[in-house]
Amino acid sequence: MAGIFKEFFFSTEDLPEVILTLSLISSIGAFLNRHLEDFPIPVPVILFLLGCSFEVLSFTSSQVQRYANAIQWMSPDLFFRIFTPVVFFTTAFDMDTYMLQKLFWQILLISIPGFLVNYILVLWHLASVNQLLLKPTQWLLFSAILVSSDPMLTAAAIRDLGLSRSLISLINGESLMTSVISLITFTSIMDFDQRLQSKRNHTLAEEIVGGICSYIIASFLFGILSSKLIQFWMSTVFGDDVNHISLIFSILYLIFYICELVGMSGIFTLAIVGLLLNSTSFKAAIEETLLLEFWTFLSRIAFLMVFTFFGLLIPAHTYLYIEFVDIYYSLNIYLTLIVLRFLTLLLISPVLSRVGHEFSWRWIFIMVCSEMKGMPNINMALLLAYSDLYFGSDKEKSQILFHGVLVCLITLVVNRFILPVAVTILGLRDATSTKYKSVCCTFQHFQELTKSAASALKFDKDLANADWNMIEKAITLENPYMLNEEETTEHQKVKCPHCNKEIDEIFNTEAMELANRRLLSAQIASYQRQYRNEILSQSAVQVLVGAAESFGEKKGKCMSLDTIKNYSESQKTVTFARKLLLNWVYNTRKEKEGPSKYFFFRICHTIVFTEEFEHVGYLVILMNIFPFIISWISQLNVIYHSELKHTNYCFLTLYILEALLKIAAMRKDFFSHAWNIFELAITLIGILHVILIEIDTIKYIFNETEVIVFIKVVQFFRILRIFKLIAPKLLQIIDKRMSHQKTFWYGILKGYVQGEADIMTIIDQITSSKQIKQMLLKQVIRNMEHAIKELGYLEYDHPEIAVTVKTKEEINVMLNMATEILKAFGLKGIISKTEGAGINKLIMAKKKEVLDSQSIIRPLTVEEVLYHIPWLDKNKDYINFIQEKAKVVTFDCGNDIFEEGDEPKGIYIIISGMVKLEKSKPGLGIDQMVESKEKDFPIIDTDYMLSGEIIGEINCLTNEPMKYSATCKTVVETCFIPKTHLYDAFEQCSPLIKQKMWLKLGLAITARKIREHLSYEDWNYNMQLKLSNIYVVDIPMSTKTDIYDENLIYVILIHGAVEDCLLRKTYRAPFLIPITCHQIQSIEDFTKVVIIQTPINMKTFRRNIRKFVPKHKSYLTPGLIGSVGTLEEGIQEERNVKEDGAHSAATARSPQPCSLLGTKFNCKESPRINLRKVRKE
């Protein structure tokens, strides 16, 4: 620190002036960014002119000079090392990594061959004109300054122009790589010239090779290693977000300075680190947001300081050399750079259009006009001007500095006007009329939701005297995407290219592509949300997001499970290595032909295919290692030269004998094994080596050193035979690694299924077209069914993986909920910060323990399955009674457990395997009339049940025929509980079993409906609190029931059907009853609803419900009012129920996963509502 202050400041007395100057620059820069964002002159130019004005004014006032000197004593090299790392890392970090992968070859062609051609052309032009009368080294440095670009300003210039995602990524990637290569070229030339001046003996070839190895290859590898270490640290370390930020900030600067000290390119290394890191490298949403905001803040501060300091650091005497011809020369350089860059891109455009994602000739104009020059150019010019080495006179350095800075300013001003005009003329804005109409409708929907929320607040008595006219006026926003009349009426109808029929414009290809893009965006958001909630691992979310991003620009294509599988396999080398070992190295014992009929060949066959022969071969290989090691030690090689020579002959004889025996035993089949050919080739090379050694004329043909090198190489190839020994062990290691890949793939499948389920809840908001909506929904349902089927097969083949993943996932969910509860206690003041921090450390320790755990959890047995059924409540008496007549039933693949319309025989608990549930007659059983009118969704008639799930519960409770068929897709093992025995359990054990079964079904259906209809509500602590206060209530058929109470949250119909007494509208289960429904009446004999209420006044609520339950309805099954209590409380209330003739309470359990057909209800969305208490009118 003392050295930095000594270099940064002239003296410690300058510290107040420096702090005041930095604060002033930050304030002025923030003001300019806010108020002059659309000003014709760019903000960087204004900041630079302010710095220049401050430098000029320093000669008129001693007070101003005092502040200017405090900044000017900073070394340009230190200035470069402070601000440049922040800018380059932030720019690389903010890029679209997945699009850069698709455009990799295009960026590589433009950045390396294109840069070289452009650099040579600029150098040729400058040397030909020779206006500045410079030397060759100065021309080389000046050309590097002019060719470079500013990636931060370039990205900012094209961000809001509406360009396509591919073009933006191409421009950003090319600008970043061009600036990095320019800096490497500039630094290499200066280093080479410095060595020439110090009279060191280095050739140009050595400098070029050394520069490529150190600045490019070594920096690239070190960047990859650093990014992997940072990602590993971020995924395993649990701690404070502020500590994460400070440590990452320190690590990045540490990486930069380590690279600079050892001779690598710190800028290139940080660019690689920024590109390899992305949003999925962070553990939580808060941490990600803090880091992004922190780096954005640093980059903006660096932006303000850099351009203001540029004006201050340019010496005032530079302006003394300025003439009008210099300004003209700078304009000439600017126009020449544009022409040469255009010619370069035009020259390589045929190759770019073939190797990349897409490329258009219009892109060339935008790439030329979008190139902004700024910080790297001026920084290199300052480094040259302030260099202590001799690169020219002060006048020559001042000319290079002036022209470099002036060209940058001209580029910033002129390109700001040209670029938007060029985009509009060339028609490259990615903003079509369909997209604008879609965004306009989205904005209108947003306004409607805002106004409806305001309308609901009008009934609040505390806001009765508020000025609602002013409130409504304040929340009414002007639609920025409002279309004019021409845009609204144009292209209302288009003709189908196949049938020449007019169809709705909203159903054209453009609208379909827009819907597909939004679908992919929603999928990515779902995967990232699952990662933040620690449901998905970091590697799994990277694969899912990468696969979705890879389809972002593919027109007419949608992501499916096959594309994810191909994408994940393309990222892994384990599969390739295993195939290589199996096909090339590992020699199987299965010969294609049997032993020969000839005695000699049959004896050879018997000898070769024995364990002893193979082991002797391995022993010979191991023994050959010792002479090989001795031959590599020069002193021992001279002493034992004769012995090594004869030993080599002996081993070669053994190899020849082995090859002859194998050829005699296997005959032509010998040449069908790759390993045999490899061994034979090594043996032939050994024979050739002996021949060359024994012939004396070899000394006259080859150099003796070359002969020695050849011998060593041959001996090394011979030792490679030892690889055959470790090949089986390597296969075992790879197989173990691939078993981990199964767990990884299982996590991907679960994340993909959840993502598709999330998409189904927001399908209405993706598009307003009914046809497109139906197509998207069919596609999502098809993909989800395929994924569930794949998940079932994987779970059947590897049940231990499924149990382990589900267990660890649920542990993470529960620990996250514990964190949410702890935060809620802290906000309410129940617990102090110190106490909360101590408890949080315990939670983090548990999370780390789960993360580090490598144990495999075995699947549940038949006896253990019963202990995990919620409605048995781990009661030994209940379980023992059920086990009396419960039996294990196994079904073969393809067998039907039951068919649609069959009478229920009992409950099937799946122990292992996968069952497909399907409705052959979608209209049978449950009437979907109401929902089909309100929604344009097709009814889902297929589902898959996996291990641990239960089939037939609701049919046994209602004694209704099965409304779906169950077919085994694998061998299925189930625990079957007969229906009669289940009824006996209700009567002999306790009616609570039946009530808890209804409660379990109600929780499952309620959880699913809330997730479907209220997807914007996080599945967190608050939602779990709501589900812990649920009640299952019977709705009578002959009595109207009011729905109104301030303590109610939701009312969900889980079985049967009800009618809205006011609107005469029918709702069939499962359905979320809307707020517009104030009074309902059952229209079926058996109807149940789930009530979710706030935690207050629960006892009063239960009593109120008991009071209004009709006693004369004999056909009503005794209902359930669930509460959060113990089993003893439930038994006590059961006695009260018997006395009062009412219903009893039971313990509420956590909701189990409910499949779409497990409850056999297929109902969709209804408006979001606040629901109330059930009472009898």
Curated annotation (Swiss-Prot):
<feature type="topological domain" description="Extracellular">
    <location>
        <begin position="61"/>
        <end position="76"/>
    </location>
</feature>
<keyword id="KW-0812">Transmembrane</keyword>
<comment type="similarity">
    <text>Belongs to the monovalent cation:proton antiporter 1 (CPA1) transporter (TC 2.A.36) family.</text>
</comment>
<feature type="region of interest" description="Transport core domain">
    <location>
        <begin position="104"/>
        <end position="191"/>
    </location>
</feature>
<feature type="transmembrane region" description="Helical; Name=S3">
    <location>
        <begin position="672"/>
        <end position="696"/>
    </location>
</feature>
<feature type="topological domain" description="Cytoplasmic">
    <location>
        <begin position="162"/>
        <end position="164"/>
    </location>
</feature>
<keyword id="KW-0915">Sodium</keyword>
<feature type="topological domain" description="Cytoplasmic">
    <location>
        <begin position="665"/>
        <end position="671"/>
    </location>
</feature>
<feature type="transmembrane region" description="Helical; Name=TM10">
    <location>
        <begin position="287"/>
        <end position="319"/>
    </location>
</feature>
<feature type="transmembrane region" description="Helical; Name=TM2">
    <location>
        <begin position="43"/>
        <end position="60"/>
    </location>
</feature>
<dbReference type="InterPro" id="IPR018490">
    <property type="entry name" value="cNMP-bd_dom_sf"/>
</dbReference>
<protein>
    <recommendedName>
        <fullName>Solute carrier family 9 member C1</fullName>
    </recommendedName>
</protein>
<dbReference type="Pfam" id="PF00027">
    <property type="entry name" value="cNMP_binding"/>
</dbReference>
<feature type="topological domain" description="Extracellular">
    <location>
        <begin position="392"/>
        <end position="395"/>
    </location>
</feature>
<dbReference type="GO" id="GO:0071805">
    <property type="term" value="P:potassium ion transmembrane transport"/>
</dbReference>
<feature type="transmembrane region" description="Helical; Name=S4">
    <location>
        <begin position="705"/>
        <end position="731"/>
    </location>
</feature>
<dbReference type="InterPro" id="IPR027359">
    <property type="entry name" value="Volt_channel_dom_sf"/>
</dbReference>
<keyword id="KW-0813">Transport</keyword>
<dbReference type="GO" id="GO:0015385">
    <property type="term" value="F:sodium:proton antiporter activity"/>
</dbReference>
<dbReference type="GO" id="GO:0015386">
    <property type="term" value="F:potassium:proton antiporter activity"/>
</dbReference>
<keyword id="KW-0966">Cell projection</keyword>
<feature type="topological domain" description="Cytoplasmic">
    <location>
        <begin position="38"/>
        <end position="42"/>
    </location>
</feature>
<dbReference type="InterPro" id="IPR014710">
    <property type="entry name" value="RmlC-like_jellyroll"/>
</dbReference>
<feature type="topological domain" description="Extracellular">
    <location>
        <begin position="1"/>
        <end position="17"/>
    </location>
</feature>
<keyword id="KW-0744">Spermatogenesis</keyword>
<keyword id="KW-0217">Developmental protein</keyword>
<feature type="topological domain" description="Cytoplasmic">
    <location>
        <begin position="94"/>
        <end position="103"/>
    </location>
</feature>
<dbReference type="GO" id="GO:0098719">
    <property type="term" value="P:sodium ion import across plasma membrane"/>
</dbReference>
<feature type="topological domain" description="Cytoplasmic">
    <location>
        <begin position="355"/>
        <end position="360"/>
    </location>
</feature>
<feature type="transmembrane region" description="Helical; Name=S1">
    <location>
        <begin position="613"/>
        <end position="633"/>
    </location>
</feature>
<feature type="topological domain" description="Cytoplasmic">
    <location>
        <begin position="427"/>
        <end position="612"/>
    </location>
</feature>
<keyword id="KW-1133">Transmembrane helix</keyword>
<keyword id="KW-0221">Differentiation</keyword>
<feature type="transmembrane region" description="Helical; Name=S2">
    <location>
        <begin position="638"/>
        <end position="664"/>
    </location>
</feature>
<feature type="topological domain" description="Cytoplasmic">
    <location>
        <begin position="280"/>
        <end position="286"/>
    </location>
</feature>
<feature type="transmembrane region" description="Helical; Name=TM12">
    <location>
        <begin position="361"/>
        <end position="391"/>
    </location>
</feature>
<keyword id="KW-0969">Cilium</keyword>
<dbReference type="GO" id="GO:0007283">
    <property type="term" value="P:spermatogenesis"/>
</dbReference>
<feature type="topological domain" description="Extracellular">
    <location>
        <begin position="191"/>
        <end position="204"/>
    </location>
</feature>
<feature type="transmembrane region" description="Helical; Name=TM7, linker">
    <location>
        <begin position="205"/>
        <end position="236"/>
    </location>
</feature>
<comment type="subunit">
    <text>Interacts with soluble adenylyl cyclase (sAC).</text>
</comment>
<dbReference type="GO" id="GO:0051453">
    <property type="term" value="P:regulation of intracellular pH"/>
</dbReference>
